[in-house]
């Protein structure tokens, strides 16, 4: 039916029998696969968007043929207003198939592990294809991973998805935790996981780092974790940009675990799933100290004397800073 009508009935378009249908099925002008935003507003706005995007020729015969094809195939479904992916050299037939049955383009956005809330807000507010604005975000509330969204998705709606993902992850990890870890509640698990996340980038070390902090909490020792002090100094804005000093260790802040016992009041970043799992399933052992070895790894020990020897040896190798903080867990 479509072939007969388009081929023989569009004489007003300059078509002779068969020519109209040939143009309907012939390769289109789009030189490469391309995403086009099809706005609402009916056939005219759809055709204009296709022409502007280079998917439909800007001449009256093609426009008439395309309009006729829309009408004659209307039982196949409505045309959708969305951002859609059109194939290279797609024919009018292909264009209509995409307009009716194509899936909207989904855009990725990645929240890296270990970002603080202020940094996550920057990532979200600078994403050009999202809409709206968010001004605040509780620390540690979103799960770091890659999310996919449609153009013009509201930032608030995307954050709600991120929060739900974190809630589900925390619930799953908490329900399957090692009871001997001694964690009191999921909130404590997330806070400690955020510190572990910032302490080491090596997944294999995270359960060991978690064990050190859990042992120190159990014994009533201060955590003395550098990332908490950095968070206090920067107000969660990001990197400190310099080495910590002895004076830094003495700042009065509930986030400075050199002066404040126990855990900080909130997470210091959004921990990834691996850090949550590390805290829920810590490595066995009695270690209470660790020091960065300078190659991305750490040296662990249960003895302060041995720890101090490790610190001295590493300072000899790397050179001692004039105002290097005498950290219990780092040189």
Language model regions located:
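Conserved SxxK-family serine transpeptidase/carboxypeptidase catalytic domain
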Residues: 224-269, 274
